[in-house]
Amino acid sequence: IKKVKKILEIVCHNCSKVLADTSDPEFVAAINTRDPKSRFNRVWTVCKKKRRCENEDRQNKDKEEEFAPGLKQPLAVENHGGCGNVQPAVRQAALQLKAAFEVVQEEGPKRKETVPITPEMAHGILRRISEEDLRNMGLNSDYARPEWMILTVLPVPPPPVRPSISMDGTGTGMRNEDDLTYKLGDIIRANNNVTQAIREGSPQHIARDF
């Protein structure tokens, strides 16, 4: 969950683009790091401070044209190409992630609003990250896509891995199921309850309670 939190602090929650770009010298130095693990941590250090996904046209924003010595053409300015959305501060509380926004009020000071980041929301953000951004972050798009860190399909171990246990130790008396089997049964029952709630058109908060 800590890795997912860091990735959510690197990318935009709306368009899934990395919040920094090559106009930032620190970001350029970070993505040129050879070791993928160190590259990820350096990119995270640069991006976690940013609170907005840039969408301004830097070429038109600069009124004064910049020229390189000895060149007649102005230097090309690469735009970030983001969506302009304000980014929340991601907070971890136990096994939950929350997004903290600063809401500007018409009268009075700013107030902070906290919204839970559900697994569905996080999975959608991580799934949209481009392969180029994954490489810049130090992740392998073939073996370490970030959305794979969130379980959508639960692997069930076969019965030999979770054998039933004899209560009296003789092997002939009453037997009890392994703890893992009980937990898998709880998960299946919860999934069935969610499916039934969705089929019956129940409100979203009821399905979320399961």
Model-derived regions, located:
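Conserved core architecture of multi-subunit DNA-directed RNA polymerases
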Residues: 1-210
